[in-house]
Amino acid sequence: MNKTAIALLALLASSVSLAATPWQKITQPVPGSAQSIGSFSNGCIVGADTLPIQSEHYQVMRTDQRRYFGHPDLVMFIQRLSSQVSNLGMGTVLIGDMGMPAGGRFNGGHASHQTGLDVDIFLQLPKTRRTSAQLLRPQALDLVSRDGKHVVSTLWKPEIFSLIKLAAQDKDVTRIFVNPAIKQQLCLDAGTDRDWLRKVRPWFQHRAHMHVRLRCPADSLECEDQPLPPPGDGCGAELQSWFEPPKPGTTKPEKKTPPPLPPSCQALLDEHVI
């Protein structure tokens, strides 16, 4: 499948009706031991943790959206990464969307983030704390040139390279999605230490943030992991294919109906949503 077709599918997956989904009616985590259920784009979570809003190492954006819930492993990853960044004097980590209290489908903006194992992290590390008003209406910093072929040199900082590398080297991280131009710059800057680049995957948009995904926890028996990324650093022909012009004659795919929920997620909805 060519890149244009994939882009259209991704857009359709994330641009669903803005009407509230049943999952948004669940306002608190479902009690129980933490269990991520299903796949990243069709699942839910029992026993989600709430990311503490107050931290000296990170700040949470758009708290009015209440998307700061996730598996305990995700909360610990955010705390671990932000502590590393702070100890290195790099700045404050800005946390975007995680998931809803019970996971599940959003009414727009995300196709994944459903099992409590995904988090968006802005690719900027401010030295001064954001105000409450700034956190509610954050300003994204677009690091990619208008033609999409490279990063903006005046905006690309060594600290951003280090932030992505630190996240990729974490034991629980399985994938990090960034814009192809950002992946290309990481490949140029990486030097001889390149093993971590395998986890960094090029994807549409993601010009101002990275989307970090954790592996399924060992005790979440109903969680469906993705296959591992292909071997290698991903800096060769695969990456360059993202910069090729779309093939002529690409047609817009039909909008697909969401697949049935995993039985455990459907049972959760039946029990907790009237």
UniProtKB/Swiss-Prot annotation:
GO biological process, one term: peptidoglycan metabolic process
Gene Ontology CC, one term: outer membrane-bounded periplasmic space
Disulfide bond residue pairs: 44-265, 187-235, 216-223
Keyword Protease in annotation: yes
Top-level class of the enzyme under EC nomenclature: hydrolase
Signal sequence coordinates: 1-19
Cofactor note: Binds 2 Zn(2+) ions per subunit. Zn(2+) ion 1 is bound in the active site. Zn(2+) ion 2 is bound at the dimer interface by residues from both subunits.
Molecular function per GO: metal ion binding; metalloendopeptidase activity; serine-type endopeptidase activity
Broad class of the protein's primary localization: periplasm
Entry cofactors: Zn(2+)
InterPro entries: Hedgehog_sig/DD-Pept_Zn-bd_sf, Peptidase_M74
Keywords for the protein's UniProt record, in alphabetical order: Disulfide bond, Hydrolase, Metal-binding, Metalloprotease, Periplasm, Protease, Signal, Zinc
Protein's UniProt keywords contain Zinc: yes
Chain positions covered by the region annotation Disordered: 227-274
Residues reported in the UniProt entry to bind Zn(2+) 2: 147, 150
Entry binding sites for Zn(2+) 1: 110, 113, 120, 211
Enzyme Commission identifier(s): 3.4.24.-
Localization in the cell: Periplasm
Quaternary structure annotation from Swiss-Prot or TrEMBL: Dimer.
Family membership noted in the UniProt record: Belongs to the peptidase M74 family.
Primary role: Murein endopeptidase that cleaves the D-alanyl-meso-2,6-diamino-pimelyl amide bond that connects peptidoglycan strands. Likely plays a role in the removal of murein from the sacculus.
Protein's UniProt name: Penicillin-insensitive murein endopeptidase
Species annotation: Escherichia coli O157:H7
Recorded name of the encoding gene: mepA
